[in-house]
Amino acid sequence: MTSLKLLKEKAPLVICITNDVVKNFTANGLVALGASPAMSEFPADLEDLLKYAGGLLINIGTLTDENWKLYQAALKIAEKYNVPAVLDPVACGAGEYRKKVADDLINNYKLAAIRGNAGEIASLVGIDVASKGVDSAGVDNIDEIALAANEKFNIPIVVTGEVDAIAVNGEVVTIHNGSAMMPKVIGTGCLLGAVVASFIGLEKGQELKSLETAMLVYNIAGEIAEKHPNGHLPGTFKVEFINALYEITDEDVKEFKRVK
């Protein structure tokens, strides 16, 4: 069974501790894809929910001291129940405090994957890449960045940009699908982190397969959305992207995928 069919069959509960700007978009995107999102931020509630969860997303976009404690509490509970956790270290290359939080979560808690742009992941491994807030300039060595992070942390790594790279157990693949409209809509990267959390726990020992499917489904949905008559407009693209996540099939992935 393909990872996409497995996701739709299992409809995994995905706990999303994410930034305030993107909660609605993230929840709608996961529902469209076939997952079941919960946006809980109360540790006692998380203790109950994570018993049944298929994934946890920690997105540090809206960072506060209290949220840092929440991330730590959620990761402890997730490890207790063997729930795969995905970290999105938003803008960790833009300031010392964010880098400190990201380092803490990576070094002291169990993670199933890290998802970030080239600037974010490069900052975690000490590679110099131009980064401005949540955005990162296009880079040529995205596969090297992914491999360096994978080797340093021994965690599956997803690095996104004009080309995306996935590194698992020293193996790297690059994804050449996607839409130039994605950066025009706030939250597309954050939703991707939640999509990764939805796929990562579907098949134990098949992380590369699951992550590759997650990236292809997401990026090809973006291409489909952009092809809409008004897909070049951010408002239309946002709506059509959700529609494409709802309608995308394995046949679409097989036909349009560009993987190296």
From Swiss-Prot:
Keywords for this protein: ATP-binding, Kinase, Magnesium, Metal-binding, Nucleotide-binding, Thiamine biosynthesis, Transferase
UniProt-listed InterPro entries: Hyethyz_kinase, Ribokinase-like
SUPFAM superfamilies on file: Ribokinase-like
GO BP: any one term: thiamine biosynthetic process
Transmembrane segments: none
Sites where the protein binds ATP: R115, T160
Cofactor requirement: Mg(2+)
Pathway: Cofactor biosynthesis; thiamine diphosphate biosynthesis; 4-methyl-5-(2-phosphoethyl)-thiazole from 5-(2-hydroxyethyl)-4-methylthiazole: step 1/1
Residues at which substrate binds: M39, G187
UniProt key word Ubl conjugation: no
EC class (word): transferase
CDD domains linked: THZ_kinase
Catalytic activity: 5-(2-hydroxyethyl)-4-methylthiazole + ATP = 4-methyl-5-(2-phosphooxyethyl)-thiazole + ADP + H(+)
Gene3D superfamilies: 3.40.1190.20
Cross-referenced HAMAP family: Thz_kinase (MF_00228)
Protein name: Hydroxyethylthiazole kinase 1
Taxonomy of the source species: Bacteria, Bacillati, Bacillota, Bacilli, Lactobacillales
